[in-house]
Structure formats: structure tokens, C-alpha cells
């Protein structure tokens, strides 16, 4: 999956699609504060990493996030850190990370068990990471 996503990420950058996506999002997000932009990017990244590999999510989301930061005149570092944190949080599905899939059978977990246990963890990470990222990288 990762081997297939790196060329996709490169193609998105080379063709300028990440710039188009970033500028389109920036038009709608221009009135939002940096906190809410980081919050939104973190949520989107967390949702994406629950479906595809975390490294592939980072390859896709990092240029988009950096483009939004550049378009709106914010420092890039907090936006990239939010992508890194969000891409590491595959707690809501058994398909988001291979470890989740491995423990599903022996633990007799159902798909809904991941939501029940992963959602509070995601909320905790959102609550702690955004203020810390703003504190450290702004």
C-alpha cells in the first residue's frame, strides 16, 4: 500500500492538485483561526488513517496541510505536526493498522469494539495535542 501511495503523493504534487485542493480549502477556511484549522486537519487525517495505512495518509495529507498553511500565512510546522499525530491514530477500525487486524481474531473483537474503545482515545489525543502543538510550534 505504501509503495503505491508514494507515487500517488508525488503525482498529486507534480500535477499541482495539492495546490488546487489547498487553495480551495483556504477559500472556505480563511475565517477560521489556526486552532480550528489544525483541529479540522487532525480530524480529517485521523479519519483517513482509519481507512488506509498511516504512512500513506501522511504522504497524501502533508502537502495539502502545508499548502493550507502557506495560503493562509501560518507557520508550516504545526500543520505538519498535526498530520504526523493524526496519521498515528488508527484506533477506530481494524483495517487502519496491521496490529488492529492481528488482535481482532484472538481477542474476539467486533468492528464496533474499535469505535467504543478508540473514540475516547481519539478525543483525548485531540484535546491534548492541539494545544501542545500550538504551544511548542507557534
Located regions from the model:
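Small-residue-rich segments of transmembrane alpha-helices in multi-pass membrane proteins
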Residues: 1-9, 63-73, 117, 126
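Core transmembrane alpha-helical segments of multi-pass membrane transporters/permeases
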Residues: 1-20, 35-47
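Short helix-coil transition sites and intra-membrane helix breaks within transmembrane domains
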Residues: 10-16, 48-60, 89-98
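Hydrophobic alpha-helical transmembrane segments of multi-pass integral membrane proteins
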Residues: 31-68, 72, 76, 84
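Alpha-helix N-cap/start motif
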Residues: 76-77, 111
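Juxtamembrane and boundary regions of transmembrane helices in multi-pass small-molecule transporters
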Residues: 84-138
Amino acid at each position: 500500500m505504501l509503495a503505491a501511495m508514494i507515487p500517488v503523493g508525488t503525482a498529486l504534487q507534480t500535477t499541482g492538485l495539492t495546490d488546487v485542493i489547498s487553495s480551495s480549502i483556504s477559500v472556505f477556511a480563511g475565517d477560521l483561526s489556526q486552532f480550528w484549522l489544525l483541529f479540522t486537519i487532525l480530524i480529517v487525517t485521523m479519519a483517513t488513517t482509519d481507512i488506509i495505512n498511516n504512512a500513506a495518509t501522511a504522504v497524501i495529507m502533508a502537502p495539502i496541510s502545508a499548502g493550507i498553511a502557506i495560503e493562509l500565512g501560518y507557520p508550516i510546522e504545526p500543520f505538519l505536526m498535526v498530520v504526523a499525530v493524526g496519521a498515528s491514530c488508527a484506533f477506530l477500525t481494524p483495517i487502519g493498522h496491521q496490529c488492529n487486524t492481528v488482535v481482532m481474531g484472538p481477542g474476539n473483537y467486533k468492528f464496533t469494539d474499535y469505535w467504543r474503545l478508540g473514540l475516547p482515545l481519539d478525543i483525548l489525543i485531540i484535546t491534548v495535542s492541539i494545544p501542545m502543538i500550538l504551544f511548542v510550534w507557534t
